[in-house]
């Protein structure tokens, strides 16, 4: 896609625990609010994560996500992880990983659904969410 820096473009290992009552699935997103687009940049969107799954292994996006998980279109134009690569010399960019506890078994979306539409669906179906932020500059 013409985007890529260091690190081999591996999706990170992430784990979680303590889901709230009523969680029927999870969704995981990664968003860069500092991208010079005027609207940020979606790096990863994974939905319909079964509640029994509490970890994604290193490079799960490329190696094959566990059964049931759907990755949807990011701002790279396709589903799957796209690693950080801010413009050279730009200020450090924030990469916000958000885990949503979702009340539905599955969001009514498909692989080509935009991150904006997934975000809309999550806005109305998230029970609780938590976030982790990383910084990257080159």
Predicted features, each with a name:
Residues 1-138:
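N-terminus-centered regions that define maturation/targeting leaders and the start
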């Amino acid at each position: 896609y013409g985007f890529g820096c260091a690190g081999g473009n591996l999706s990170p290992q992430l784990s979680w625990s303590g889901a709230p009552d009523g969680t029927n699935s999870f969704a995981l997103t990664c968003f860069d609010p500092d991208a010079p687009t005027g609207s940020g940049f979606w790096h990863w969107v994974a939905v319909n994560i079964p509640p029994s799954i509490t970890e994604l292994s290193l490079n799960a996006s490329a190696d094959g996500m566990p059964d049931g998980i759907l990755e949807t279109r990011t701002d790279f134009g396709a589903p799957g992880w796209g690693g950080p690569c801010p413009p050279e010399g730009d200020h450090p960019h924030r990469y916000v990983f958000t885990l949503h506890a979702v009340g539905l078994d599955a969001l009514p979306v498909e692989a080509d659904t935009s991150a904006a539409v997934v975000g809309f669906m999550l806005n109305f179906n998230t029970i609780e969410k938590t976030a982790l932020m990383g910084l990257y500059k080159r």
